[in-house]
Regions:
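Exported/periplasmic ABC-transporter solute-binding proteins
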Residues: 28-29, 34, 38, 42-76, ...
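C-terminal motif of bacterial Sec signal peptides marking the signal peptidase cleavage site
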Residues: 23-25
């Protein structure tokens, strides 16, 4: 059965189609906006002694491709500045920071994990009283989209969230979602609730399998180990998958990526400067090429 892209998924699919060219061009471009030039000049200040400086960035797995591309350009513009990236689920990264891992900049795929580390967040959000976030540096950096993907050549007839819900109710497919501590899993839980589906019952019936981060969910769909999975638009791009539907705000809310420098950052000023660079038009072009919306 030929899979059609729903109207909700059209913009994401269109962005995926043009993403490769933008990511390829990013590293070799010599053009620069005024804001990115200013940020680059500022970044050079901390590495002015000629010694190399390594920024440690903890970021949601869905940022792997874009941050690597942007960092390549940034390092070329700022000799001596290098990056050590830790890409994983936001829940895992939050735990590592809490346990004392060195981290200059944290970019989460959800507000929940950032709030848990931010003492200025509400008591409902900062349930453990943790104080790792430099609150003045915190910004909402990006918005992503939650999409439904199926393996290439699938004949299950899953072409929308509506049809997914019907198959889940019939218990005749295997569906993959993120764990409950992973933002994409939390968004998926909201989608299931939207359709009055009970995750625990579906899992007990053997209808659901899990991934520890969004990349694992994407891999299971790509390898046709499952009949469908919920991932981000950006991860659909990186895996070469075409989304068949896009979740609405009513289904799971907005997918906002907050970013903040950590209070115990080894290179706090340089981290702030790189975060400022991530908010330039130049960086936005890379983010938006794979389906993100720069905020």
């Amino acid at each position: 059965m030929k899979t059609m892209i729903s109207r909700r998924g059209f913009l994401c699919a269109a962005g995926i189609a043009s993403a490769s060219a933008v990511l390829t061009a990013c590293g070799g471009s010599s053009s620069s906006t005024a804001s990115s030039t200013a940020s680059s000049a500022a970044a050079s200040s901390e590495a002015a002694s000629g010694e190399s400086m390594e920024l440690i960035v903890f970021a949601a797995a869905s940022l792997t491709e874009t941050l690597n591309a942007i960092a390549g350009t940034y390092s070329a513009e700022n000799p001596g500045v290098t990056f050590s990236f830790n890409f994983d689920s936001s829940g895992t990264l939050k735990t590592q920071i809490q346990e004392g891992a060195d981290c200059d900049l944290f970019i989460s795929a959800g507000q929940k994990q950032m709030n848990q580390l931010d003492s200025t967040a509400s008591a409902e959000g900062n349930t453990e009283g943790l104080d790792f976030v430099d609150a003045e540096s915190r910004v909402d950096l990006l918005e992503n989209k939650v999409v439904l993907c199926v393996p290439e050549g699938s004949n299950k007839g899953i072409d929308s969230f509506d049809s997914l819900a019907e198959h889940l109710k019939a218990e005749d497919i295997l569906f993959c979602m993120g764990n409950s501590d992973v933002p994409v899993g939390q968004y998926t839980q909201k989608i299931l609730a939207y359709y009055d589906l009970y995750e625990a019952a579906l899992a007990a019936a053997g209808v659901i399998t899990y991934g520890s981060n969004v990349k694992e969910v994407t891999t299971q769909v790509s390898e046709a180990s499952v009949d469908a999975g919920v991932v981000y638009c950006t991860d659909a791009y990186s895996a070469g998958l075409t989304p068949v539907d896009e979740a609405t705000k009513e289904m799971c809310g907005q997918v906002i990526y907050p970013a903040a420098v950590m209070k115990n950052a080894l290179h706090a000023e340089a981290a702030k400067e790189f975060l400022a660079y991530l908010r330039t038009d130049k960086a936005a072009t890379v983010f938006e090429s794979v389906g993100f919306t720069a905020l």
